């Protein structure tokens, strides 16, 4: 099971069955997710980063690329990539802080390592500033500082 971030605001959850998963367990999980938590459920194959992270992290990486190319600031980009375009107010960089910068780096590395034939493979590289923040312990919301700092 994989929740989309931030889970309290995002409607979808992914269920990823293995070959040995009991269908009754999946049915029970889907029922719990839909009726108790009010989530929409998407079934996904067991592939690197499932559906949500493949699309979401690619979107973040593309945004990072364009942020650098157009010399934009993080606040400016989040102002453009949140509710203005139908996304959560956490937008791009704040969502990265919520997910955790260490988690982001792991997902990016997984994409780079496991998807060599993807046409966008050249973008599956964490920027140097991400590594610098992680090395300082600025892992995002869970550490009180990441791309943004809680004051």
What spans do the regions from the language model cover?
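N-terminal glycine-rich phosphate-binding loop for ADP-containing cofactors
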Residues: 1-151
């Amino acid at each position: 099971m994989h929740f989309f971030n931030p889970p309290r605001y995002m409607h979808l959850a992914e269920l990823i069955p293995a070959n040995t998963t009991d269908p009754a367990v999946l049915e029970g999980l889907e029922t719990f997710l839909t009726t108790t938590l009010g989530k929409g459920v998407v079934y996904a194959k067991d592939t690197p980063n499932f559906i949500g992270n493949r699309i979401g992290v690619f979107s973040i990486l593309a945004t990072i690329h364009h942020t650098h190319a157009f010399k934009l600031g993080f606040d400016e980009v989040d102002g453009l990539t949140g509710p203005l375009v139908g996304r959560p107010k956490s937008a791009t960089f704040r969502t990265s802080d919520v997910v955790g910068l260490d988690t982001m780096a792991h997902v990016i590395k997984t994409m780079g390592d496991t998807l060599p034939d993807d046409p966008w493979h050249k973008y599956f590289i964490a920027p140097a500033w991400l590594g610098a923040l992680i090395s300082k312990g600025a892992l995002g919301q869970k550490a009180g500082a990441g791309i943004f700092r809680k004051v």
